């Protein structure tokens, strides 16, 4: 988590709007979220996670970093939930998902694309970070081994195919804006609604 924060911040700096609400899906412990809120003080960073323990951790990080009331309390939100907008205090300008696609079932990827498309207005952005294979081929031996270890832990998990995800995003109403190669064989894909 710690080693990729700065490269992710640097990339998001080029992709996100300068003001408004950013919804982070599957925020985990909240370490990324508080880092992003501090890096982007003109944005409101809204963390979310389906796990109540993670939400408590996020809220603890917000208090520890003294980011309240600028940074709102975590939302207990599962990516598969409908009507994300009903839980938000204001419309979102972007949705961010970091290390979600490979440690969740394929249905979560589809839900992320579908629900983000419903939530975002024209011009809204979806930024997804993590490992991808390309046209069914792993981009490195380490990604191949990582994929095998994920699937051994849970057969529904695994490194997703970039081409397949791009197709599903297009079907949901997104146009790819950038695909950026990131450290440790990861990628940041940014779509625009």
Predicted features and spans:
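A conserved beta-strand element that flanks and buttresses the S-adenosyl-L-methionine
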Residues: 96
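Conserved S-adenosyl-L-methionine
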Residues: 26
């Amino acid at each position: 988590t710690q080693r990729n924060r700065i490269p992710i911040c640097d990339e998001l700096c080029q992709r996100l709007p300068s003001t408004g609400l950013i919804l982070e899906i599957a925020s985990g412990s909240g370490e990324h979220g508080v880092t992003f809120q501090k890096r982007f003080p003109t944005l409101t960073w809204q963390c979310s996670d389906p796990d109540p323990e993670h939400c408590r951790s996020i809220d603890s990080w917000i208090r520890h970093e003294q980011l309240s009331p600028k940074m709102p309390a975590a939302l207990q939100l599962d990516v598969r939930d409908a009507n994300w907008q009903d839980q938000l205090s204001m419309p979102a300008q972007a949705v961010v998902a970091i290390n979600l696609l490979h440690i969740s079932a394929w249905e979560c990827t589809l839900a992320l694309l579908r629900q983000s498309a419903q939530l975002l207005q024209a011009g809204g952005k979806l930024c997804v970070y993590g490992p991808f294979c390309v046209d069914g081929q792993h981009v490195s031996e380490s990604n191949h081994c990582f994929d095998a270890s994920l699937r051994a832990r849970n057969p529904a998990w695994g490194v997703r195919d970039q081409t397949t995800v791009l197709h599903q995003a297009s079907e949901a109403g997104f146009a790819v804006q950038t695909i950026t190669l990131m450290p440790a064989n990861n990628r940041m894909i940014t779509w625009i609604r």
